[in-house]
């Protein structure tokens, strides 16, 4: 996204919308994960849109919080008040989910606030209006975000452990 300094990730999705056809995966660029997470997401039950979630004891202001109802996602956002999980920023779309997502992304970018929205705000909108967003837990598997320079040492160790596990397998 050449406009990353002026926009949020919804605009990046808009730029890539021509590639978002058929079945596809969408991953936040700052998310690191062990291979088993991708395997679990791909093997999840069929759904228009599937969001990977993790659960933990407490959540901070920067977490992308999620409210679930069984396997259904009811709400997602950093400021929602009721939540029971967090999104790790890794999603799977089927062809109909992809079409719905890109249509709403296009509509959102036509609004004044669209340039500053997260793409997960579109997922929240879809969950509220269409009830086609499901969740797949990756609880117990390792993942991390690369948000701050302080994250680098831990993330290097984590990635090295994944490589060692793969090489040793």
Question: Model regions: which residues?
Answer:
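Conserved core of the sugar-phosphate nucleotidyltransferase
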Residues: 34-113
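Short beta-strand-to-loop acidic/aromatic patch adjacent to the donor-nucleotide binding site
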Residues: 22-32
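Active-site phosphate/pyrophosphate- and oxyanion-stabilizing loops and adjacent acidic/basic residues
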Residues: 14, 39, 124
């Amino acid at each position: 996204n050449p406009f990353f300094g002026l926009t949020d990730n919804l605009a990046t999705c808009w730029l890539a919308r021509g590639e978002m056809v058929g079945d596809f995966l969408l991953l936040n660029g700052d998310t690191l994960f062990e291979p088993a997470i991708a395997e679990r997401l791909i093997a999840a039950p069929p759904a228009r849109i599937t969001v990977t979630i993790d659960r933990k004891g407490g959540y901070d202001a920067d977490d992308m919080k999620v409210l679930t109802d069984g396997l259904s996602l009811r709400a997602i956002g950093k400021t929602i008040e009721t939540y029971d999980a967090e999104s790790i920023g890794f999603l799977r779309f089927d062809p109909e989910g992809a079409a719905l997502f890109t249509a709403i992304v296009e509509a959102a970018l036509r609004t004044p606030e669209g340039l500053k929205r997260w793409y997960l705000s579109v997922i929240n909108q879809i969950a509220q209006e269409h009830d086609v967003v499901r969740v797949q837990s990756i609880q117990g598997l390792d993942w991390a975000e690369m948000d701050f320079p302080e994250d680098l040492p831990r993330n290097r160790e984590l990635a090295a452990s994944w490589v060692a596990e793969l090489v040793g397998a």
